[in-house]
């Protein structure tokens, strides 16, 4: 399976876009749409600090990395889940793994593969850091009901300083614009 456009927008809206490297809430260097060194090539810690001179080009680069990252997480979810699932369930699991990297060790996965009708409750076993709660609730609801909380009209692009701290909103991007920028790649 591949993530749907709505699933892609769900992740982008939860993550936001940061065109320069920043320290996330756990102190991990991150860039673009939630990309960390743990996700693969392009280590944010090794990137030039602060806002790039050409923000639009940096956003396009971040979207290319996001596309590569999605390919990786799609493969991971496809390998981990052994039972048939719907598109919205797949989208919720890609979001979960994109954020946690935990699809192979999660009780959630074990319960889905065991056809446990209450498997989605296990999304709530992954609440660190505490501010992630809303995302887990959204992922759980998406898995259970197909209700996408993100409608793609508010993908925030954040400014970052030379020390890797977020410094306010640069702009809000509409999902249609994000999809158009990614169209050649998806």
Describe the residue ranges of each PLM region.
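Alpha-helical segment that forms one wall of the substrate-binding/catalytic cleft
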Residues: 45-81, 87-109, 117
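Low-complexity, intrinsically disordered short peptide segments enriched in small/polar/basic residues
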Residues: 30, 52, 56, 152-154
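Short, conserved, surface-exposed binding loops centered on an aromatic residue
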Residues: 21-23, 84-85
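Substrate-binding/active-site groove segments that recognize
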Residues: 23-49
């Amino acid at each position: 399976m591949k993530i749907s456009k709505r699933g892609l927008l769900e992740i982008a809206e939860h993550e936001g876009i940061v065109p320069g490297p920043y320290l996330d809430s756990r102190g991990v260097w991150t860039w673009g749409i939630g990309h960390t060194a743990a996700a693969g090539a392009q280590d944010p810690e090794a990137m030039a600090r602060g806002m790039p001179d050409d923000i639009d080009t940096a956003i396009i680069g971040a979207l290319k990395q996001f596309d590569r990252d999605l390919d990786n997480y799609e493969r991971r979810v496809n390998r981990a889940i052994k039972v048939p699932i719907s598109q919205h369930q797949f989208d919720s699991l890609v979001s979960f793994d994109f954020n946690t990297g935990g699809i192979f060790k999660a009780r959630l996965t074990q319960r889905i593969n065991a056809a446990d009708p209450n498997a989605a409750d296990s999304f709530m076993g992954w609440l660190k850091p505490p501010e992630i709660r809303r995302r887990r609730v959204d992922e759980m609801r998406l898995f259970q009901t197909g209700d996408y909380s993100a409608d793609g009209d508010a993908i925030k692009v954040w400014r970052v300083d030379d020390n890797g701290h977020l410094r306010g909103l640069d702009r809000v991007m509409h999902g249609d614009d994000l999809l158009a920028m990614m169209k050649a790649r998806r």
